[in-house]
Amino acid sequence: MSTKEKLISHVMKEEPVGSGNKVTVVGVGMVGMASAISILLKDLCDELAMVDVMEDKLKGEVMDLQHGSLFLKTKIVGDKDYSVTANSKVVVVTAGARQQEGESRLNLVQRNVNIFKFIIPNIVKYSPNCILMVVSNPVDILTYVAWKLSGFPRHRVLGSGTNLDSARFRHLIGEKLHLHPSSCHAWIVGEHGDSSVPVWSGVNVAGVSLQGLNPQMGTEGDGENWMAIHKEVVDGAYEVIKLKGYTSWAIGMSVADLVESIIKNMHKVHPVSTLVQGMHGVKDEVFLSVPCVLGNSGLTDVIHMALKAEEEKQVQKSAETLWGVQKELTL
């Protein structure tokens, strides 16, 4: 008899039981791993699968996390074969070419489209009912690409969008007012990145509109220069990349925040990238961030934001820029 047989007496043969809330992270780069650890530490799933084409890096990251299994309640698996991702509830795609210092997110696009042509069909094959969350940049265009390649209904494909931009915005407003970001309500919509749109008209603390107190807020004529805060949001990622080479922690936490709302069916509102055709005067098939309700079925509702004419114009301009790039893509 083996030690195991001497220690344990078998009562019944276990049937394989699928995990009810399995999450897959595609890509074990900086963002993928920050997302993975954030999801693990928030205890969001029974099983976390990781997949990547870089076999050694993947194996090392999976082993490193598994060595911490004692401190977690999640089964951790990883393989370059997508069968390891089977029956995922949420699949987070972080894989792709990384933004170089000074490179715009839009410049990355065709490089990443080609990578997606391999990834997306594999996800669909093994998790045909999953909710697909795109994080790779340029996120709005790649969410559109994932939607097209997957054939999924629009409510099951979303991009991490401006969830992080809005978090940065709220953090910076909080710094200026000496308040916790959760008490500073503020939204950034539109494109994740350089042409994102700060909705100054909606910025409030405890229901008190800041623009009501300072009508010039967010304009050139504002003596307090609140506009600089949005510039800081846009430049924030570039600044972090310049200083440490990449961004990871905040986007990882942002991803876990979105995964939590889906898995726990929270019906929380997040600014995420979705199909906005027909909203805010957008005519083309583009994905941009607007406030959306997230739950177990995916992206269930969109909140009608009252945008000022100038804000709406900026959203339309973003949409035109993205469509200009999208229509040149070979899918």
Swiss-Prot record:
Reaction(s) catalysed by this chain, per the record, are: (S)-lactate + NAD(+) = pyruvate + NADH + H(+)
InterPro entries in the record, alphabetically? L-lactate/malate_DH, L-lactate_DH, L-lactate_DH_AS, Lactate/malate_DH_C, Lactate/malate_DH_N, Lactate_DH/Glyco_Ohase_4_C, NAD(P)-bd_dom_sf
Q: Which GO terms describe its biological process?
A: lactate metabolic process
Annotated binding of substrate, by residue? 105, 137, 168, 247
Which keywords does the record carry? Cytoplasm, NAD, Oxidoreductase
Q: Which Gene3D superfamilies match?
A: Lactate dehydrogenase/glycoside hydrolase, family 4, C-terminal, NAD(P)-binding Rossmann-like Domain
Return the EC number.
1.1.1.27
Q: Which residues bind NAD(+)?
A: 29-57, 98, 137
Q: What is this protein's record name?
A: L-lactate dehydrogenase A chain
Q: Which organism is it from?
A: Paranotothenia magellanica (Maori cod)
What gene codes for this chain? ldha
